[in-house]
UniProtKB/Swiss-Prot annotation:
Gene Ontology terms: cellular component: plasma membrane
Disulfide bonds: none
Gene that specifies this protein: bmpD
Family: Belongs to the BMP lipoprotein family.
Residues bearing a lipid moiety (S-diacylglycerol cysteine): C17
Signal peptide: 1-16
Keyword match Cell cycle: no
Lipidation (N-palmitoyl cysteine): C17
Name of this chain's protein: Basic membrane protein D
Assembly and oligomerization: Monomer.
Lineage: superkingdom: Bacteria
Membrane topology of the entry: Lipid-anchor
Function field: Binds adenosine and inosine but not guanosine, xanthosine or ribose. May be part of an ABC-type nucleoside uptake system involved in the purine salvage pathway. Other probable members of the ABC transporter system are substrate binding proteins BmpB, BmpA and BmpC (BB_0382, BB_0383 and BB_0384 respectively), ATP transporter RbsA and 2 permeases (BB_0677, BB_0678 and BB_0679 respectively).
């Protein structure tokens, strides 16, 4: 009898251990790879906040990796080997490698923010999220043009490409829409990771009479903000990707935000609950879909609330289709031509 009890207890122990192991194996793993650094005070930082909130709320495993061009393939392979169920990529520079990995590795799901896939069929296990960045950039340009005291505003971009061009042309179009005589100085620094270069580029612009700069350049853009802080009053910034007013409360007037964190959170949560990724396509988000927004710095509200409210009305015209915002050189040239006629 004792022998039977002994074997029964062993059986229960084995079953309990197996159940415990099964519970652990059921925990999903969501990974995040970004181009550059996580502490960019913008796009990458927002994505990190989203995935960490998912971990806290849903008790999942997460893996975060900051990467650069030559390391993309190896870093993504490591995420795949880490039993990732879903791998998020942040930034257009990851477009090609994520397309390749999704095509070759159908057992893993992938999603990318701002992938560039023109007229290409995306694999079913890859979801691309693309923002109509030109729309919020148009509002930023309109605001800057109305707020400028010198009649000269600037744009500093990181690496030139389709996404950054939509920012630049949208910004320039909005500025011209507000004031056809405004002068817009646009410059790319060629990197998202050079604080010093962003700082010196902005300093030169300010010295040349620019009083408001819209910076879409990652860590290089933080250098632009630093230049405005150092130069003091009358040197202003339009923030990007998230509300950046906390970085320079006296200089960042408004921010052109992309709601990356809330979007990533909701899409990932849905995937984890259903086990289904609605991939094989690009999801386009703009002002109408509440994927973008212009946020006013509360510290400067008394000085700029009127211009801000006018900018929001322009946003309504964009959402209603009254204003067609340009996103590249051809559409921008046509936009300017129509304004002149």
């Amino acid at each position: 009898m004792l022998k039977k009890v002994y074997y029964f207890l062993i059986f229960l122990f084995i079953v309990a251990c197996s159940s415990s192991d099964d519970g652990k194996s059921e925990a999903k793993t969501v990974s995040l790879i970004v181009d550059g650094a996580f502490d960019d005070k913008g796009f990458n930082e927002s994505s990190s906040k989203a995935i960490r909130k998912l971990k806290a709320d849903l008790n999942i495993n997460i893996i975060e990796k900051a990467s650069t061009g030559n390391s993309y393939l190896g870093d993504i392979a490591n995420l795949e080997d880490g039993n990732s169920n879903l791998i998020w990529g942040i930034g257009f520079r990851l477009s090609d490698i994520l397309f390749q990995r999704a095509s070759e590795n159908v057992s893993v799901n992938y999603a990318i923010i701002e992938g560039v896939y023109d007229e290409i069929q995306i694999p079913k296990n890859l979801l691309n999220i693309s923002f109509r960045s030109e729309e919020v950039a148009f509002l930023a340009g309109y605001f800057a043009s109305k707020a400028s005291k010198t009649g000269k505003i600037g744009f500093v971009g990181g690496v030139r490409g389709k996404v950054l061009e939509s920012f630049m042309y949208g910004y320039e179009a909005g500025a011209k829409y507000a004031n056809s005589n405004i002068k817009v100085v646009s410059q790319y620094v060629g990197t998202f990771g050079d604080f010093g270069l962003g700082r010196s580029t902005a300093s030169n612009m300010y010295r040349d009479g620019v009083d408001i700069i819209f910076a879409a350049a990652g860590l290089s853009g933080i250098g632009v903000i630093e230049a405005a802080k150092e130069l003091g009053p009358d040197h202003y910034i339009i923030g990007v990707d998230q509300d950046q007013s906390y970085l320079a409360p006296n200089n960042v007037i408004v921010s052109a935000v992309k709601k990356v964190d809330s979007l990533m959170y909701s899409l990932t949560k849905k995937y984890l609950e259903t086990g289904v990724l609605d991939g094989g396509k690009t999801m386009f988000l703009g002002l109408k879909e509440d994927g973008l927004g212009l946020v006013l710095n509360e510290n400067l509200k008394s000085n700029y609330s009127e211009i801000y409210n006018k900018s929001l009305k322009i946003g309504q015209s964009i959402m209603n289709g009254i204003i067609k915002v340009p996103y590249d050189k051809v559409s921008y040239d046509n936009f300017v031509l129509q304004m002149e006629n």
